[in-house]
Design a protein with these regions (language model features):
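A glycine-centric feature that highlights glycine-enriched low-complexity/repetitive segments
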Residues: 1-490
Length: 490
């Protein structure tokens, strides 16, 4: 934990010189990259496609959307990796560290097998947990030195990357580890890798675009909602959305070969449940959204953008509060109020122009009542149902206990180290504020994990039309599964 606190302080010092100018006033919007430059490098002969959490083997329906199409030249292979994350993928699933460790072995073997073919070159497509695995593989290749593949033989396309240097959830809280969950905050994807890399992030994706200032509780909640409503949508993107991606700025003198892109999200994910309310849901959401946008975006440092506008290649941990002038916030809220009222009024006018239709109500017939009584459950069915409810409640309770244990045992030590480090540096405000910010941010993540602890069968990575096979295992969640040997497609 001392190392974690020291890492935090070092990272804060590294970006301190750029933070002042970028937060004092709203930053200029980065310009969209030219379509021909997305991705900024040609695909290699073979593309290895790795699925997100919950989808260990991507089905054919996942292999056609716009981002994927831009990373394929000749051969495309979906590769199996565990992609489990206790408790999000079930109470008997693998913990993150074990799943990542197994996936890293498979990814490394797959790359080396493909590159053993003379003249072959590989593009790795990673999404969510497989983006973590790809990031760790970059670190591994760096450690291999001359034995690693050459830069011309390998490149990466990553989406929904939890290790984004300046937005990923696993980089916001440096070197934090939750032993009770066997979950490591791995840090940042290497920005100095020799392998050309393109990283795409959807705005408000809570895993890949987490709030920079977690004391902003509303921004944290919006990011957590984005795990469900945004992180799952990468394969639903249209070509126009991908081509309109905004290339994020990198630090002066940056000579790396990684490009970072943000794709804007139209609606705040925190309002998606309200929009699901019939008739009045959308008008109310449109009334609230402009001002909510200002509040949420302040969690990233600028009321105009739902992502950090500072350098994308610099590992940026959480901070205390953005240095945005109060007048800028007041003006943005005033404009948001006016915009919300106009949108709400327009929605009501559109509703009033639609013909009013009332549902037809049919009273039950005597025969229907008799049939309902006959279909009533038997005592045995009632007992079995109660047993299933008890079993289900136990399954729900177990992750809650594990998460609570992780926070109770680890968070106090982490925040204490932050307090001591900042106090030793003579910064009393940060000594009090940083532990509080960490507690608010991690507590909100905890609440979100409980809410999405049992994702649909389609997987946490994607919940719409692309459904992958469910990975079944009889292994305990801390036990490493049998090693899967990668075999190239013939």
């Amino acid at each position: 934990m001392a190392a974690a606190a020291n890492s935090y302080a070092d990272a804060e010092a590294a970006i301190a010189s750029t933070r002042q100018n970028q937060l004092a006033v709203p930053a200029a919007a980065p310009t969209p990259a030219a379509a021909a430059m997305i991705p900024p490098f040609p695909a290699n002969l073979t593309t290895l496609f790795f699925g997100p959490t919950g989808i260990p083997l991507p089905p054919p329906s996942m292999l056609t959307p716009p981002i994927r199409c831009r990373s394929v030249r000749r051969a495309l292979q979906a590769v199996f990796t565990p992609e489990e994350l206790y408790p999000l993928t079930g109470v008997r699933s693998l913990v993150l560290n074990t799943s990542v460790e197994e996936g890293l072995t498979i990814l490394h073997d797959a790359i080396m097998v493909e590159l053993a073919t003379t003249g072959n070159a590989v593009t790795v497509f990673g999404w969510s947990q497989s983006a973590i695995i790809a990031s760790l593989e970059m670190q591994r290749f760096t450690a291999m030195g001359g034995a690693a593949p050459s830069a011309s033989d390998l490149n990466f396309v990553l989406v929904g990357n939890e290790m984004n240097p300046n937005s990923g959830m696993l980089a916001r809280f440096p070197d934090l580890t939750l032993p009770a969950l066997d979950l490591t905050f791995y840090g940042a994807t290497p920005s100095d890798t020799i392998y050309p890399t393109a990283i795409y992030t959807l705005e408000y994706d809570g895993f890949a675009d987490f709030s920079r200032y977690p004391l902003n509780f509303i921004s944290d909640l919006n990011a957590v909602a984005g795990i469900t409503f945004v992180h799952t949508k990468y394969l639903d993107l249209t070509p126009a959305q991908v081509e309109g991606a905004t290339k994020l700025p990198t630090s002066p003198g940056y000579t790396g070969v990684t490009d970072y892109y943000i794709i804007r999200t139209e609606n705040r994910p925190l309002l998606q449940p309200l929009r699901a309310v019939p008739v009045i849901g959308d008008p109310l959401a449109d009334l609230i959204q402009p001002n909510l946008k200002v509040i949420v975006n302040l969690g990233y440092g600028d009321p105009n953008y739902g992502y950090s506008t500072s350098y994308a290649d610099v590992r940026t941990p959480f901070g205390l509060w953005p240095n945005v002038p109060p007048q800028v916030i007041a003006d943005a809220l005033a404009a948001g109020t006016q915009e919300g009222i106009l949108d709400f009024t327009a929605d009501l006018q559109a509703l009033s122009a639609q013909p009013l239709t009332l549902p037809q109500i049919q009273l039950p017939q005597p025969a229907d009542l008799v049939a309902a009584v006959a279909a009533a459950p038997t005592p045995a069915e009632v007992v079995n149902t109660l047993a299933r409810i008890i079993s289900t409640n136990y399954a729900v309770l177990l992750p809650t206990v594990d998460i609570a244990l992780a926070l109770v045992t680890t968070l106090p030590l982490y925040t204490t180290q932050l307090f001591v480090r900042q106090l030793a540096a003579g910064n009393l405000i940060n000594a009090i504020g940083y532990p509080l910010a960490a507690t608010v941010g991690l507590g909100t993540i905890d609440s979100g994990r409980r809410g999405i602890a049992h994702p649909p069968r389609g997987g946490l990575g994607h919940r719409s039309k692309h459904r992958g096979p469910r990975h079944l295992t009889d292994s305990r969640r801390h036990r490493r599964p049998p090693t899967t040997v990668y075999r190239p497609r013939q």
